[in-house]
C-alpha cells in the first residue's frame, strides 16, 4: 500500500498541474495584487480542511500576511462528531464570520473538499459580500456527486470567484483492498497543501519581479531570523492579531 499511496498522490498532483495551472496562476496574481495593495490572505476550513490553513500560517519560507480563521468548535479537538454536526448547520457561520475583519483588498480561500456543507458556503458568501476575492479549493468530482446541504441548494464551487479543483475522488479515499469494505487513504490534505504553497510561491516571485520586497518569514531556528521576522510581524499584527496573541506587550 505504501507504493500505491505515493503513486496515487503523484497522480493527483499531476492532474492539478495539468488541469489547474491557469487557475493556480490566477490565484497567485490575486494574492500578489492583494499584498501589494495592503490586503492580506485569509483562509478558512472546517474539520481536517483547517489543517491547510494552518500549514501556510506563520510558516518558515511562507508569506507573512496570512490569516487563518480558527473556529475551535469546527475543528476536531473539541469534539469530532460535533464539529461535523456544526458544519452542516445553516446559519451557524454568522456566529463567527460576521466579526472577522474582511476587506475588499483581501483574498479569501475557502477550503472544503466536498463543498456541500453550509458553513464553508456561508463563509464564502460572507467574504464575497465584504468585497474579498474568494477562492475555493475543492473537489469538483466529489461536489457534483452529492446534493448540497445549504439552504440555497448551491455548492461551494458555485458561489466563489475562482475554483481550484484538488482532483480528490468522491469520498476523498483513494485506495481499496479486497479485504476492506470501504475505500481508505485520503489525498485532499496533501494535495491542498501543495496547491496553497505553489500559489503563494508564485505570488512571492511575482512581487519580486515587480520590484516589491515580498514579506516572507525566515525559519525561527536560523540565527538572525527573529530580527527579520519581527519587522514583518510589526507591520501585520493589527490585521492578523493571532500572530501575537498571548505575547507580553
From Swiss-Prot:
One GO MF term: carbohydrate derivative binding
InterPro entries documented for this protein: RpiR-like_SIS, SIS_dom, SIS_dom_sf, SIS_GmhA/DiaA_subfam, UPF0309
Stretches assigned to the SIS domain: 31-214
GO biological process: carbohydrate derivative metabolic process
Domain of life: Bacteria
Homology family: Belongs to the UPF0309 family.
Protein name: UPF0309 protein GTNG_1302
Source organism of the structure: Geobacillus thermodenitrificans (strain NG80-2)
Amino acid at each position: 500500500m505504501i507504493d500505491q499511496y505515493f503513486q496515487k498522490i503523484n497522480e493527483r498532483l499531476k492532474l492539478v498541474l495539468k488541469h489547474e495551472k491557469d487557475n493556480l496562476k490566477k490565484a497567485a496574481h490575486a494574492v500578489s495584487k492583494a499584498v501589494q495593495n495592503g490586503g492580506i490572505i485569509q483562509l478558512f476550513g472546517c474539520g481536517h480542511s483547517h489543517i491547510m490553513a494552518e500549514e501556510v500560517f506563520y510558516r518558515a519560507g511562507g508569506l507573512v500576511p496570512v490569516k487563518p480563521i480558527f473556529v475551535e468548535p469546527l475543528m476536531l479537538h473539541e469534539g469530532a462528531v460535533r464539529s461535523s454536526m456544526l458544519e452542516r448547520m445553516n446559519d451557524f457561520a454568522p456566529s463567527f464570520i460576521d466579526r472577522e475583519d474582511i476587506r475588499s483588498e483581501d483574498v479569501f480561500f475557502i477550503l472544503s473538499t466536498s463543498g456541500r456543507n453550509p458553513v464553508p458556503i456561508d463563509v464564502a458568501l460572507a467574504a464575497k459580500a465584504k468585497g474579498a476575492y474568494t477562492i475555493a479549493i475543492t473537489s469538483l468530482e466529489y461536489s457534483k456527486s452529492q446534493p448540497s446541504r445549504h439552504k440555497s441548494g448551491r455548492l461551494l464551487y458555485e458561489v466563489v470567484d475562482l475554483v481550484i479543483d484538488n482532483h480528490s475522488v468522491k469520498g476523498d479515499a483513494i485506495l481499496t483492498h479486497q479485504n476492506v469494505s470501504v475505500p481508505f487513504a485520503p489525498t485532499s490534505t496533501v494535495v491542498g497543501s501543495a496547491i496553497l504553497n505553489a500559489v503563494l510561491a508564485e505570488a512571492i516571485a511575482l512581487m519580486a519581479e515587480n520590484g516589491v520586497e515580498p514579506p516572507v518569514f525566515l525559519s525561527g531556528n536560523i540565527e538572525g531570523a527573529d530580527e527579520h521576522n519581527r519587522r514583518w510581524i510589526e507591520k501585520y499584527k493589527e490585521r492578523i492579531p493571532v500572530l501575537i496573541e498571548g505575547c507580553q506587550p
